[in-house]
Amino acid sequence: MRVSEVCGLRWEDLDFEKREISVNHSLVYARWDGDGGKETFHVTTPKTEKGTRIIPMMDEVYEALKAEYAHQEETGFCTTKIDGMTGFIFRNRFGGVLHQGPINRAIKRVYTSYNDAELLKAAKAKRKPLLIPHFSCHHMRHTFCTRLCERETNIKAIQEIMGHADIQTTLDIYAEATDEVKHEAIKALQKGKDIF
């Protein structure tokens, strides 16, 4: 999911019985005409027409969302109202909604902290440090899609899960098969079929 789609998720967008997420809007923090030139939150339609979709939850996502729901039953649900919508799942430390800026800053704090410690350890051990490169929410979306492409052969299913308007986007940008995956694909073909 795009970070704006994740930030815009509301409890009513989840179907815990079917383990599905309804992606039908995005929460965007930007400058808008009529808002006096300041940045504000607005609910918008997804980035593309294909962006409106139903996606299945992975087991880890299901468990994390159930745990968050239980936590919010004790601590209170988000009551922020934006463009008539409320009940947003992901909150900042003050109980308001999140946007990509603070999320990307939190990610940066994690890898910067690790890299700082790794630089010291590597210097003490007189070895080359193993550093985590810069990454953001979008990089995680890209990585998710790449891993999905490595494990799934139905490109149409991948397009629908990712919400790409054009299947060419799925093929061009995300289908980055590694040499190892290409070798595994040929081995699987040979094992599963008598092709000669």
What are these regions (language model features)?
Residues 9, 68-71:
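Residue-level signal for well-ordered alpha-helical positions
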Residues 27, 143, 162-187:
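Catalytic-site neighborhood detector that most strongly recognizes the C-terminal catalytic loop/helix
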Residues 1-33:
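Short, charged phosphate-coordinating catalytic segments
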Residues 55, 71-80, 85-97, 101-160, ...:
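Short, basic (Lys/Arg/His-rich) helix/loop patches that form interaction surfaces
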Residues 18, 25-52, 59-61, 93, ...:
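C-terminal secondary-structure termini that scaffold catalytic or DNA-interacting sites
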Residues 3-11, 97-100, 139, 144, ...:
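Gram-positive cell-envelope targeting signals
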Residues 8, 16, 172, 176, ...:
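Phosphate-coordinating loops and pocket residues in cytosolic domains that bind phosphorylated ligands
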